[in-house]
Amino acid sequence: MAKRVTIGDVAARAGVSTATVSRVLNGGVATEATATRVWDAVTRLEYTPNALTRGIFAGRSNALGVVIRDLSSPFYLGLLRGIDDVAAANDSLVMVANTFRNVDHEVDLVRMMDEHRVRGLVTTTDERTDSRTRHMAENGTPCVIVARTAQDPPSGLHSVSLDHVGAGRLMAMHLIECGRSSIGVVTSGGRPSQIERVAGLRQAFTQRGRSLAEEAVTVATTEEEVDRAVGTLLARADDRRRPLDALACTAGRLTVAVHTALTARGITIPDDIAFLTMDDFSWAPALGISVITQPSYQMGRRAAELVVDPPAEPVSIVFEPALVARRSCGERANV
């Protein structure tokens, strides 16, 4: 096995000390002749600097830490692309960890990111990790919470989120405009984004002189629970003698499961029931599924920019949702 070239080999080739090589590689002061000899030795020996050693001397690595709750959501793919593009442009490595929605694991992963002295942290974790994230920010590591707003953030703690109430309002207005009147909602639980989207749905219905009954909203925290949730909504509507003519899903990661639950029951979209969900994905156009989109790529870029060029004061950035109308709500029939 070939021996890895070391900084000592470069120093010997250039005829200088290892301290001089380190200084040149890190942009320190050196004469032009010395720098030329060092870089020539680096090139000829194909030397790769040790990022770990650099991090030790700098007191921080050059990696940008990202803690994701659930990579099954289409939202996170665009988010990661945006983060990676900014990191690459700033000579940073992206260190990604997926928590699988396990809060204890989330806390551990944020702690480990801190222990690895990442350049900064972008996190989509539960509120119960905020004390650890806040601790990192207070100790000089820029942190960005994505998908919700940080409460009373200290310097160094920022947030990038969506207008979730606006997303819910867009859902309600589109379904109403498509002539739907008996609407059920599948949401994924108590996350601020889910609560605010349902609140937006209610607001829009109220403004149109309608209401969204409590029993018209059901929670499914996992894909396995979705079939039961859809069945419950259909049964409740039938009991009220107002069969559902629309179903809204406020969590993009549950889209496939909700769509499957409807079609498995022989329900035709949109003839029997309109279907509207969050977050666009690769096969949505082929199936004609209408969606409320959030600009995940732009959100990822902005989050990473807050890490690589951190502002002095906390920043909270809110992006606007958009409707992509296809045909799953009966749009063509209403043209």
Annotate each PLM feature.
Residues 85-130, 151:
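Central regulatory/effector-binding core of bacterial HTH transcription factors
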Residues 11, 123, 246-250:
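Short beta-strand scaffold positions
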Residues 69-78, 96-105, 148, 159-170, ...:
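Hinge/beta->alpha junction and helix N-cap segments in small-molecule ligand-binding domains
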Residues 1-6, 43-81, 89-90, 100-101, ...:
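N-terminal helix-turn-helix/winged-helix DNA-binding helices
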Residues 18-22, 56-72, 174, 182-188:
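Short beta-strand segments enriched in small/hydrophobic residues
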Residues 101, 123-171, 253, 279-289:
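Flexible loop/hinge segments that line or gate small-molecule binding clefts
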Residues 235-335:
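Flexible loop/turn connectors
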Residues 1-60, 333-334:
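N-terminal helix-turn-helix DNA-binding module of bacterial transcription factors
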